[in-house]
């Protein structure tokens, strides 16, 4: 198949976009240097990224910082990779309280949840998290394939997944049966209701950990956050006053400190969590009950479709593997599309 040639106008547009991107990076770096030379920045200190707003991030000082508490918007130096909520960084606060600081270095991450952007590049969602809370609800319905995407992403990032059925008061038998199917596969599952306040089981697993909510818009992630954090409106107003954005913005992940210890990251809704950054082996590993059959096929290059002697197909036919899970695996292995935001 021949490569489509770009016409002159298309090449001009691509070059112009690239020039504008380079110019923006140069202006950002020049601004950081200007602040430093003018004495507009304080000394370097470690910090935590609470939220990400376009080209700026919201950073707070760590609890044990000898220089005391500080919370500011910051630019990111042009030589740094994209930052994520939950990142630990080195930063220089602005000397003025309402100024803009600069993030000068990214500290090593112990984990990173990421997905492809519209161009197939890495888009960090949250960093340094311990467990991924996959929130589903009777309405809107989350497909099994979407749940499996999150489970694969959690496995690839070495995160502990937990399936959370919210709006339990609206759940039907089919919703509870699906939860039981995943519980039978070995996944931890909870059913609860933010509306009725039945959150004791959830509260027990949050202290001492960094957790992240993921799931479709409308499944009640924000309602769960509001129930867990009675003072959430006050915290949100403080963040909004610094960012200049509204209180109900759902386009960015935000980190909140829990009263009982631990942190919680609330992420925006995602229709489909893309796995285009993962290899086929990584996707297969995210289905542990199926991956255990690897190496039993007659042919080493088996595609697990219609080849004779395929151990996977035989196990499904014998009822030893879930037909639905095997269909999800085949779909994900064939899917190279990037994720799309709600």
Describe the residue ranges of each PLM region.
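A conserved segment at the C-terminal end of the G1
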Residues: 221-237
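Catalytic P-loop NTPase motifs of RecA-like helicase/translocase cores
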Residues: 142, 171, 198, 271-274
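Solvent-exposed alpha-helical segments within well-ordered globular domains of core cellular machineries
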Residues: 87, 145-152, 176-180, 184, ...
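C-terminal effector/interaction modules appended to NTPase cores
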Residues: 1-155
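Arginine/glycine-rich "motif VI" loop of SF2 helicases in the C-terminal RecA-like domain
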Residues: 153-159, 182-184, 292
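Canonical P-loop GTPase G-domain recognition
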Residues: 160, 167-219
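Helix-rich effector regions associated with P-loop NTPase G domains
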Residues: 2-17, 43, 72, 81-95, ...
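Conserved active-site beta-strand-loop modules that form the wall/rim of enzyme catalytic pockets
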Residues: 211-213, 218, 222-226, 254-255, ...
């Amino acid at each position: 198949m021949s490569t489509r040639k770009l016409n002159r106008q298309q090449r001009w547009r691509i070059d112009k976009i690239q020039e504008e991107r380079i110019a923006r990076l140069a202006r950002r770096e020049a601004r950081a240097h200007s602040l430093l030379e003018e004495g507009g920045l304080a000394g370097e200190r470690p910090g935590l990224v609470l939220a990400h707003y376009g080209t700026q991030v919201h950073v707070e000082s760590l609890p044990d910082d000898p220089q005391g508490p500080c919370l500011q918007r910051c630019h990111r130096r042009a030589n740094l990779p994209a930052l994520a909520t939950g990142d630990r960084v080195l930063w220089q606060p602005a000397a003025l309280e309402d100024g803009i600081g600069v993030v000068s270095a990214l500290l090593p991450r112990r984990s990173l949840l990421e997905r492809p952007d519209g161009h197939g590049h890495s888009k960090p969602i949250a960093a340094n998290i311990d467990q991924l809370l996959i929130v589903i609800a009777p309405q809107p319905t989350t497909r099994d394939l979407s749940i499996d995407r999150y489970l694969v992403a959690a496995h690839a990032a070495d995160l502990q997944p937990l399936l959370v059925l919210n709006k339990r008061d609206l759940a039907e038998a089919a919703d509870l049966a699906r939860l039981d199917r995943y519980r039978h596969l070995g996944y931890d599952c909870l059913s609860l209701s933010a509306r009725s306040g039945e959150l004791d089981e959830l509260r027990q697993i949050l202290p001492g950990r960094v957790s992240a909510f993921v799931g479709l818009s409308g499944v009640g992630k924000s309602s769960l956050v509001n129930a867990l954090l009675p003072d959430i409106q006050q915290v949100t107003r403080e963040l909004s006053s610094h960012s200049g954005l509204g209180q109900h913005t759902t386009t960015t992940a935000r980190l909140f400190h829990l009263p009982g210890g631990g942190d919680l990251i609330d992420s925006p809704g995602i229709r489909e969590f893309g796995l285009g950054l993962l290899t086929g082996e990584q996707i297969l590993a995210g289905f542990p009950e199926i991956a255990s059959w690897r190496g039993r096929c007659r042919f080493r290059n088996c595609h697990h479709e219609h080849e004779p002697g395929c151990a996977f197909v035989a196990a499904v036919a014998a009822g030893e593997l879930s037909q639905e899970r095997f269909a999800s695996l085949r779909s994900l292995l064939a899917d190279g599309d990037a994720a799309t935001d709600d």
